[in-house]
């Protein structure tokens, strides 16, 4: 794939065969569309869906809970970390959320003001805190790295555009140039989906640890990666 990459203060544009993905900073006016793509991208993802599958009597109730959870996670994360959206033919197709070395971590207060009360009402305070503890454990390995790092928190691609190279393009032609242009030389990422492992290794990440984490009676895999630029 041959891309022309145009970088300005706020926008990166990729052109391939006259198709264009324009990356820009997320702004509130895109919230409804971005939340739709973000929500649809992570259906069945182990950390956000799988650990709760046995908790609800119907898939409809599970879906309702999942949507509340994932929207709250998005809103909490973008309070601290940079969010970029890839727009193609006027539609949001890709979402990239990245934590810079200077960013403060997302904390309980960020979640509290982003809809956490609705989660507590459905699964209780104790299980909510246990879930937050599980989420923290997914990042223990990468947070132990002493060098300054850029962390790819989320890479979401609209399901209608998956397997078309959008995810790889977001890493190779947007994220890596973004990090390099800001003086960075290390990117980390974690995933809880085994099918994502070859995606990241094929895009230049090195697997540094594979582990199993527990939440109540459920277990999920956790894979941690780094890319040295």
Language-model features and meaning:
Residues 163-177:
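Conserved acetyl-CoA-binding loop-helix of GNAT-fold acetyltransferases
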Residues 95-156, 214-216:
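Conserved acyl-donor/pantetheine-binding loop and adjacent beta-alpha core of acyl/acetyltransferases
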Residues 56-82:
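Active-site rim helix/loop that mediates acceptor-substrate recognition in acyltransferases
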Residues 149-150, 179-192:
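Conserved GNAT acetyl-CoA-binding A-motif
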Residues 188, 206-224:
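Conserved catalytic-core motifs of GNAT/GCN5-like acyltransferases
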Residues 21-36, 40-49, 100:
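A short beta-loop-alpha structural element at the N-terminal edge
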């Amino acid at each position: 794939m041959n891309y022309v990459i145009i970088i300005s203060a706020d926008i990166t544009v990729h052109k391939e065969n006259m198709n264009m993905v324009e990356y820009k900073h997320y702004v509130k006016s895109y919230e409804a569309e971005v939340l739709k793509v973000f929500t649809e991208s992570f259906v069945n993802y182990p950390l956000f869906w799988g650990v709760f599958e046995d908790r609800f009597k119907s898939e409809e109730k599970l879906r309702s809970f999942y949507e509340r959870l994932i929207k709250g996670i998005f809103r909490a994360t973008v309070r601290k970390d940079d969010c970029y959206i890839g727009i193609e033919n006027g539609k949001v197709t890709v979402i990239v959320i990245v934590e810079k070395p200077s960013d403060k971590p997302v904390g309980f207060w960020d979640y509290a003001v982003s809809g956490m009360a609705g989660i507590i009402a459905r699964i209780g305070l104790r299980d909510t805190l246990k879930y937050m503890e599980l989420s923290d454990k997914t990042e223990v390995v990468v947070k132990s790295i002493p060098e300054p790092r850029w962390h790819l928190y989320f890479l979401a691609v609209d399901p209608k555009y998956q397997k078309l190279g959008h995810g790889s393009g977001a890493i190779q032609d947007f994220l890596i140039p973004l990090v390099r242009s800001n003086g960075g030389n290390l990117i980390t990422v974690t995933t809880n989906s085994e099918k994502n492992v070859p995606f990241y290794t094929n895009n230049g990440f090195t697997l540094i640890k594979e582990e199993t984490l527990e939440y109540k009676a459920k277990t999920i895999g956790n894979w941690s990666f780094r890319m040295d630029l």
